[in-house]
């Protein structure tokens, strides 16, 4: 299972009964925003070749949209393609880690354990278990080696395995680093955490989550994919070798995904979970603060990770997020915690970044973020070039010379037919040559452009170049 800090992920949603189907259909999002989200999802699927995506959106703290795109099952010589629906389930992979962290925090709230307890208090015999804390395993700062860093299912993972066998193998190896001194993504950490939940409660991990979280939130579609494959009414997982044809992905052996990536559900139900994160309805406020606070290393360096969640800054807005990938499925869940917005995306092909791309393009649109001054200037110049004009008062001499009548005409003839982009967002900034460098993504349904600019301290532009995105 790849590191969700570096993977980009997609997955779709599935249901099992007409009653559930009716309950999962949601569409109260503003039509203009809905159209932009639909266009983004369709474009990303077209560009990546991912068969399907299921998307659910929370706005103002409430689920307002659930929709699926593409084919949940591809056509074969004997059967037609099956369209994806919002009622279909997909494996959510490492997004499951949020639920494991929540289980630990629930137990801390009732005094059953503490985040700063050594894990050896509950699971004797692990490497330096008297030093490594529960907080460190939930934040990937323990030093325990990842049992699945590969981006494919090895033959050794096809037979069944138990959590205890994983712990006995990887939890008793020498640590990769001193506890608390580095951040390194490791699924082993969350297998250990799940085992602690079972030890403390005396109940199976999935049963505890069902009783304390899923039933409370009305998440009726949740499936334990670590113990049974998804059904025929759920999305089919796919993978490919190099750029070859899509093939049905092999399933990991039972037991391998315990507590680290075992859950499957609809995007609709993942969005119900996001509602609870925004409303802080499952845990006490102090527990959410611990979960959402970036864990710092012993040297004071940040990790961009809390407890089972990534902690990011998106253009000045706090984002609590995580991706997930298991064989044939990729997902992404982004929650703009102070804006009441969440975007959950599930896809049914592994090793592709469609889910993250959809989530990160859609989230600021749903939140209604206004363009920054730098973005607005870039957009205004872009619109002017589409009409065959350029405001030379904004340009330094070199750039003014660059925009010859021929150059302006080429910009107009190539950009005007594209119309209004879906998104126009700054993606990077840096200092170079006494100027500020900025790059922007310009996204269309069937085209992705990159704009690069250089700006002097006095605000004059030295560069404004557009090219196809690599």
Feature locations, PLM:
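Short solvent-exposed beta->alpha transition segments
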Residues: 389-433
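Short, conserved catalytic-motif segment at the N-terminal edge
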Residues: 28-90, 112-117, 172
